Amino acid sequence: FPAKFGLTAYQYIWQNAGTVFRAYGLTIIVTVIGTAVTLVLTSLIAYPLSLKNLPGRPFFNFYVFFTMLFSGGLVPAYIMWTTIFNIKNTIFAYLLPNLLLSAYNIILVRTFFMTSIPDALYEAARIDGATYFTIYRKIVLPMGKPIMVTIGLFAGLGFWNDWTNGLYYVNRSQMFTIQVLLNRMIQDIQALANNPGGGSGSGALVNLPTVSIRMAIAFVAILPILIVYPFLQKYFASGIALGAVKG
């Protein structure tokens, strides 16, 4: 552990400032696009599932729940994404695998719609001639803001913190997100610490505790989240409380 306060770890990260800022930019793009698409798809699936008059509603609800129990496996997924969709070393490597919607999020949003939006609103809108999509756009989405912000926060954190897809599908440094880049930095520092005579790094880095590097990298990775979260906290708390009333 560090024996005294120092900024050597941050200086090491700052030496790669251009790469770090490029990774930040790519991560922000992935997070914004991925979160927006996730919110649209999740709400479009949860909305009809919340309607009591949906034909076959029990089957579709069970179908969504069933996907929580099983996974297709890593190897089939890797073959599918790299051979059929050809996402290797592209921005889609961070987007498409994560856009396989979370059944938990769908159930959470569906439950919120069922328990927080009165049936009388649906009936009044239908009497006035509103289509189901109009109801979704003008009633469901505005009233569902707390749960949508909550799911958006979940999805945004997922896209921001994702490094496994970068590990599987990306080997070009120009396409590293901040998490993938910082993970590579940790691996480089660990290798240098384990083999101090085999690298060309400075003596300060060789003697620098890897814990210092890990903590500095963790702070750099989480800093944008710390800035954004206070503005979303009230929606997060209310969305979780209301969406989890009953399943």
Q: Locations of the language-model features?
A:
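A hydrophobic, multi-pass inner-membrane permease signature
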Residues: 1-247
